[in-house]
């Protein structure tokens, strides 16, 4: 997409960050003590072993603790890998979590002081882990309140995305939580990826261009590549107006997964011309 200097990044996998709301007598009213360990530190495994935790579907084992021997010669390849710390190749820019409607909904059920303490522990570079990335969806995802895009109804022929509008998931939950996180870590990099394009942009196949009125599967209609690119830019600009700067976008979440709750099949042969649009 030839718009400003926004980077397009392809992510093979994403980590979903969800905070589970637990029912208890004090629920979300009491502050969370993040400093006092609940148990004594685990003992260091015996030299040459690794600690294991096993859970089986039949319930016989549930986080059963054990040890596994390392480098005992059994089933080991005859090749030795040596690490040279002086040789450096690609670098890792950072690590992060997905910020979804469900996680933000649960966070907003918490006492504000407890929520602030939790977010500081995760995102603060001085008082916490210093998590440097957050991923949000461009439209709905697995953890949204429902299926939607930001332009479910096609606009005019001259401006097909004239009906673009953020959904309540973003306005009432994701954006407020992102602002809280950014107040803790202003250098946080936010990336976005769509699960699906608007349904009116979908076709069953790119040759016949038969319409595909479905949240799952389907292809991006080649006729709408430029329109969909403008949809991305519109999202970036609208989020900026709301105080959220998008660092990078990915063309498609799980591009080969046709069966997700919302999905768009986008193999590289179709993704490449879209990125160039």
Predicted segments, located by residue:
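Short, conserved phosphate-binding/catalytic loop or strand-edge motifs used
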Residues: 251-257
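Charge-rich, low-complexity intrinsically disordered segments
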Residues: 234, 257-260
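Bacterial N-terminal signal peptides
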Residues: 10-20
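Short glycine/threonine-rich loop-to-helix capping motif typified by GTGT followed
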Residues: 259-267
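N-terminal zymogen propeptides
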Residues: 43-74
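N-terminal catalytic cores of secreted or lumenal carbohydrate-active enzymes
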Residues: 63-246, 266, 272, 276
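Bacterial N-terminal signal peptides that target proteins for export
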Residues: 2-10
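Bacterial Sec-dependent N-terminal signal peptides
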Residues: 19-46
């Amino acid at each position: 997409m030839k718009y400003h200097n926004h980077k397009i990044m392809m992510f093979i996998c994403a980590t979903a960050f969800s905070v589970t709301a637990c029912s208890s007598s004090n629920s979300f009213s009491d502050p969370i003590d993040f400093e006092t360990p609940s148990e004594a530190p685990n003992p260091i495994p015996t030299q040459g072993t690794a600690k294991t935790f096993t859970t089986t579907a039949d319930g016989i084992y549930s986080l059963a603790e054990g040890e596994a021997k390392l480098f005992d010669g059994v089933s080991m390849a005859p090749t030795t890998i040596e690490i040279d710390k002086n040789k450096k190749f690609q670098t890792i820019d950072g690590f992060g979590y997905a910020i979804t409607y469900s996680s933000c909904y649960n966070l907003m059920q918490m006492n504000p002081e407890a929520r602030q303490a939790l977010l500081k522990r995760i995102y603060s570079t001085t008082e916490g882990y210093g998590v440097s990335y957050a991923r949000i969806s461009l439209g709905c995802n697995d953890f949204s309140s429902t299926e939607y895009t930001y332009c479910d109804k096609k606009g005019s022929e001259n401006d097909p995305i004239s009906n673009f509008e953020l959904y309540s998931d973003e306005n009432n939950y994701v954006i407020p939580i992102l602002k809280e996180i950014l107040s803790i870590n202003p250098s946080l990099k936010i990336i976005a990826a769509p699960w699906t394009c608007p349904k009116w942009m979908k076709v069953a196949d790119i040759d016949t261009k038969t319409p595909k009125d479905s949240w799952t599967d389907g292809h991006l209609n080649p006729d709408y590549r430029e329109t969909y690119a403008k949809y991305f830019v519109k999202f970036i600009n609208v989020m900026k107006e709301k105080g959220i700067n998008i660092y990078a976008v990915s063309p498609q979440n799980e591009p080969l997964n046709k069966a997700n709750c919302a999905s768009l099949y986008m193999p590289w042969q179709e993704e490449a011309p879209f990125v160039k649009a």
